[in-house]
Amino acid sequence: MSNLSSLKKLMVGFLSRHNFSNRDYFSGETYLRTFDHYTIIDKVYTTKYGICMELNYVFHIILTNHHIPNYLVKCHKKKSNGDFYDLFHLAIIVELDGSKYFIDVGFGEHFIEPVELNHNSITGNIKVIFNQLENTNISTYDISTNNILILRVTDEPLNNIKHIESNYQKFFHSKPEEFPLCRVLFERKFDAKTNQYIPLVPDYQYIKKANY
């Protein structure tokens, strides 16, 4: 089995056992408000669900324990007005056999296998566009499907857990008009037999109403 095949197997195995869910935002639970290494690992393994920061952080640990070079990265979703949300989505970049791959086990849709990060590369129905930020050594990748931008990935390792903690706190204190995931209960499980995400609740079931 190739290294890429092994990586995909790990990813599918994790997706199959852990659902994406933002239910904790609506539940009022308080013990989850601190992004602590052991608390997050225990939470994900116990409940078998989580949001991007929880799921991708735990999978990052799993990859590291398997001696697979990887690092956490910030990604941003685009608003309808063209700006990007301040809250970032957490994901992973893996370095394998001289190539980079985008890994996301905490989105709840689209991502079912490692996505090769090369300019104009296509993995399944995911297309990647490479960008170099002017006057910096930082690069970004625009990840889209059907010509719709899903995420802008900043290729810069996020090594400080305090930065994730700050974003985590910001998410749980955000209002519905400030971030899409704070408006609806969104829960998905991954079916490895069909390679599809299955909704656990009706899509876009509104829990909190806001003017946005």
From Swiss-Prot:
EC class (word): transferase
Keywords noted in UniProt: Acyltransferase, Transferase
E.C. numbers: 2.3.1.-
SUPFAM superfamilies per UniProt: Cysteine proteinases (SSF54001)
Domain of life: Viruses
A single GO molecular function term of this UniProt record: acetyltransferase activity
UniProt keyword Transferase, yes or no: yes
Record keyword Protease present: no
Pfam families cross-referenced by the UniProt entry: Acetyltransf_2
Catalytic residues in the record: C52 (acyl-thioester intermediate), H89, D104
Family (UniProt): Belongs to the arylamine N-acetyltransferase family.
Name of the molecule in the record: Uncharacterized acetyltransferase R151
Native organism: Acanthamoeba polyphaga mimivirus (APMV)
